[in-house]
Amino acid sequence: MKETIVAQATAPGRGGIGILRVSGPLATKVAQAILGKCPKPRMADYLPFKDADGTILDQGIALYFKSPNSFTGEDVLELQGHGGQVVLDLLLKRILQIDGIRLARPGEFSEQAFLNDKLDLAQAEAIADLIDATSEQAARSALKSLQGEFSKKVNELVDSVIYLRTYVEASIDFPDEEIDFLADGKIEANLRGIINQLENVRSEAKQGSILREGMKVVIAGRPNAGKSSLLNALAGREAAIVTDIAGTTRDVLREHIHIDGMPLHIIDTAGLRDATDEVERIGISRAWTEIEQADRIILMLDSSDPESADLSKVRSEFLAKLPSTLPVTIVRNKIDLNGEQASESEQGGYQIISLSAQTHDGVKLLRDHLKQAMGFQTGIEGGFLARRRHLDALEKAAEHLQIGLVQLTEFHAGELLAEELRLVQSYLSEITGQFTSDDLLGNIFSSFCIGK
């Protein structure tokens, strides 16, 4: 028998309204115990909420949704009372005294909705993303995902793969036909079409992942290069202490900002040098840890000091120590001291931004560069949010499509192509939860709020 769960659906703490949600086959039993009746489905009823001895604990609106016409697909009872935490706790305690009722786990209401086919997995995740959105664009995109925009694109891909799989397997099952299906060009054309279709979805998903998770950008360089001043300029406030004393920043400073809707985690680090001070050495060690985990590095150079701005020395002292795949933007700071104009150029395969963090001249160039470098497009309508697991699944699907193309065009191997298409279908279906593991479901829903 399915379990009946209860939890507070509104945020803990003091508020104008507090809501308790009950979901499961015993929701009507709870209604009879607390309200003395079960409200008509989908009709608001103003009633007292009573304790076991008949004492009125609160009074408010009761709503009943009969299965399957509810968010979870189960019978659902919502009690909307006053938002005092003591009152809500008393009411919750009373409900938990009823046999067969237990406290919901985090995300369990959404999990019920998923298991009852009210939402697919991508839509369920979008609920948490909508709650956690840190910008207007992220909220709008999360709502698009909740409404099924992302799932629709994935399902269209799955349908295309299934159609092609059927065609390929038919050519394998009927080898005596006069027509060589593998060589007639139709399968290759369809396969290339799916590859292009998937690339479009991957591009949108990458944008959605940036919106959801942000990008980690680490500002690094020698002491007194102006790293903290740049952090303040990008943040638009005095987030870091700035002095003329080299080594002022000794620990990692973090600031979360938005550039035209793109979330960035900007991290200011201790100046990189051979330090004798133990505290500074620890700060430098932490700086290298952050650098290794970054999505992009901003390497600060002091343009007023010819030695520190020498790119050949910078390459040997710093750039050579970085992973080759880690993107780096070089910033020549303090152009106000030598009369230079703000500019953007390219040298040795690196983008170089010349600016003044002190006067903010050229800071907009850096902001625009970061947007472009991260592949972020401002103001896209109809986008959706995506998670890292979605990107991983799409990437694996793309890899197997390319392998399948090689099996078809170079080896004429229908059986191997069919297997690659099966794997593609499996990876894509993981996104919406058609094929997934219990461990994955547990990890996803445990990250939700209790009551969602």
From Swiss-Prot:
EC number: 3.6.-.-
Annotated residues for binding of K(+): N224, T243, I245, T248
InterPro entries found in the cross-reference section: G_TrmE, GTP-bd, GTP-bd_TrmE_N, GTPase_MnmE, MnmE_dom2, MnmE_helical, P-loop_NTPase, Small_GTP-bd
MF-aspect GO terms: GTP binding; GTPase activity; metal ion binding
Cofactor descriptive note: Binds 1 potassium ion per subunit.
Family affiliation: Belongs to the TRAFAC class TrmE-Era-EngA-EngB-Septin-like GTPase superfamily. TrmE GTPase family.
Subunit text: Homodimer. Heterotetramer of two MnmE and two MnmG subunits.
Protein name in the entry: tRNA modification GTPase MnmE
